[in-house]
């Protein structure tokens, strides 16, 4: 029950319905199932919307309507008396928050329109007003609110700013690192610190590798709940724990034993093949068979009796025994077919080889790790201190401040917990541990609502941890008192062809080991409607592979990315879709794993005339030509003796010096000086005192004088003005901004130049001043091989979309092409010199000196890089985590498609036909095989090979060069402009025929367009009505004339000395008033008088307006109340322009006008027009203005592609306002 106050100050009591019990929810589910609605909510959706009083985890598969569920749940909470500001709603992006807010707003407007309860209308209107203040946004945005409000409690000023520019962060980091590095090099433990630096950088002069290590450790720690505690307690966890063979995790031993047993099984399967050759011609066992049987028996025995024969302490001995047993090669050949039986086992043995030696030297690296721990802790504290001094922080800092505020201030934490009725989280699978801690502090322990899908967790590079979701999933399934799991499996997005291939692929690929979740019946996609199950044979998924057997070298290697041939395959399929099926370009989307080869795709599509829009490429802003020219201009202004920058400026279009000019200048040196800069030579050339003054001709001298004069002016400006003004001065004085407008990609180039000025302005506003510091900042960004974000420009809508898989998340497209499926997964991180893990801490490659072990006496040292045990442990986990993320990326990419999905890659047809595995083992691909395959394409081919007897819902097709010729690819069909059959019969001579045609054309034009000669090309509805009304509506004219003559009232003459107010002026004033009138306030005389002051009319006209009549319209008519209820949908005094065809001349003309008011809804439009004409009967004005409203309706329909369902005239010329529907 809720109490509100009405306008009279009286309490309004609203009785809200209680939350539904489990029995009521079941009843609602049954009613929904039996209803005849075309679109029904699923039982699980209803459960997710209405279940309350406990923690809820909604596992929502792709396309299952999770946003719909969230919006409906929020609306249900509001309708049951929970104010919107008592809900905490976290989204992953700002865009998602905006969309969610808009959906809630639309739902509230719809609910207001449906309800007849006035008190409920008032309450819902209040919720609308509170919506903009509600906590709907990202975790970063909420953390900023907390710190802005309560930062004082931990000593943080509320007047902070966010450092979003990575370049600024890098500059500060570099300053802190350099100072700290010097301190550590001069401390007592300097020898240990030098050894630490050398272990990663090779020498103490080049600190880049060590700096990267420190920065990475710092960034990793920032994603934890408490960075300082993690660095102190977890950073060296594995280094302290794993120091003996007995410390090796059981899981790693199990994987080794599993690889041994799998090898024995695969070898047995191979030896059982008919063509293997177990026996010799004499009938005895062959030597090969005997050897392989021995391997099978020993591997099986060692696995079975591992604990008795070896145990963990004897692991090193087991590795030696297995290494000596199996052959050094990977393959066993049968009938010229190679089977990689030993490949996986060799990889596992490599992991465990030299364990005793590694453990012997591993203890020597522990002092180095302690030094690293101290350095990273000191760096974290010093960097934070600098940011506090600057009052500028990163998002992670703000989040940790918010956590600290809530942890250390019980009253603040409890106030939040008591305030929030529910803590709701979208995209829960992408949370990190810092965010999870913040959510835990906001919740009261039983009011969390989490929506996500672990199969779509693809942000590990942002330290997102899918195990947070996974752990909740397991806990809630085992311990129902902690919370409830609800599965949304129905997919409402894709046709069965997409759903079937997705289920087929991931049921063979994804489990807890790789993918972090078993893709079983719980997680498989189910069509949500009957329409999705209708089969389309031409929409079966396709794996299209360019056959690289005869690759002519045009294709780059895997590391380089996609080849021209692969893109041509895509172009061919798109041309076929567009020409044969009429598929518009905007229905087609290309997905890539990275943007590195977008240029090849765009270039190829341009060749075939296919329009394409990309979501950006690599960040190359600072490397764009126009920006480099301007940066060199600024460098020259700062220091003219910078020869590189000066030459670039002289050669630029601003001054246009050519090679000959520069050569002549270069010869003007001073023989007495050993080193002479170009700027000095220019000055000597101008005054004629160079070594060869005769080389400076008049034209060159004039160019030099102009240059020196301009440079002097710029340098003076740099001392007096801001960076922003200086850059704009550079643009315009030498017309460079105008010059780039004439070049290719002019719009992008001009946007880049203007963005440079804006970034300089932002740089100065952040507290830095001066041209020198700005150039230094830019140079540091370039030194760190970073760049600034590219500038976005407007893109065409009717074009194929090209974007990364990450960017496509949450979107859907009819046709999806997944490109570059042959691209190897990036395993760069597992080959670095260090690997971080949240639980185990850091593992490193240690550069050990094994001089003593080898007995070497000649050399000073013998350094060998060793993978320490913590490193190997982290490496294995990271490898599986990387493969899992790639698998989820493939899932996201495939489930974006509505109708059809294509996989594009390249492979050798002959090699791909080799059998991957001799035997199908269970439903999943063997774990060892999934670990071994490192491309989407390899996974798909392995599934197609091993499970070839199943219908996998995708076809594999190899494309040859002969399929990619110009004729085979085809070209886009364009509408034919001329029909050859319509050409004039050529029976007469060409001259006579042309003369007759000209005479006929002139006569026809004069006849057809006679009316157009006397009519304007731009007309208004009033002009149109006056011109054609007698022709189009003669009956209506007669009625009006008769009715006007039958009026019996006679108005007495008015003899006032005041000037008469024209009716048109009153009408204009009424329209102005209706435009500016604030509808959010109650409409009364005071509101009208306040609004009246703001219109542009004289006092006589304002006095002539009947405000009581206007008040009556809003208070006493349903249409007036409609204005106030749906004010968010209202557009007032909207201009329009449409093309019309003149009925007499058949010539097109522009019709312009202004629509008084219209309401724009999702599926229809309501049109309103005010009239102040005097009338006797409303039917008169209805007939008079019917055509005018039809024109307005036509304009709105053309603009929005929606029907105008209602058209109203508001008549203000009578005794009271009247509403007439036309």
UniProtKB/Swiss-Prot annotation:
GO terms for biological process: double-strand break repair via homologous recombination. One of its GO terms (cellular component) is DNA helicase complex. Keywords: ATP-binding, DNA damage, DNA repair, DNA-binding, Exonuclease, Helicase, Hydrolase, Isomerase, Nuclease, Nucleotide-binding. ATP binds at residues 60-67. It holds the Pfam family PDDEXK_1. Residues 524-810 form the UvrD-like helicase C-terminal domain. It catalyses: Couples ATP hydrolysis with the unwinding of duplex DNA by translocating in the 3'-5' direction; ATP + H2O = ADP + phosphate + H(+). Its EC number is 3.1.-.-, 5.6.2.4. InterPro entries: AddA, DNA_helicase_UvrD-like_C, DNA_helicase_UvrD/REP, P-loop_NTPase, PDDEXK-like_dom_sf, PDDEXK_AddAB-type, Restrct_endonuc-II-like, UvrD-like_ATP-bd. Belongs to the helicase family. AddA subfamily. The heterodimer acts as both an ATP-dependent DNA helicase and an ATP-dependent, dual-direction single-stranded exonuclease. Recognizes the chi site generating a DNA molecule suitable for the initiation of homologous recombination. The AddA nuclease domain is required for chi fragment generation; this subunit has the helicase and 3' -> 5' nuclease activities. This is ATP-dependent helicase/nuclease subunit A.
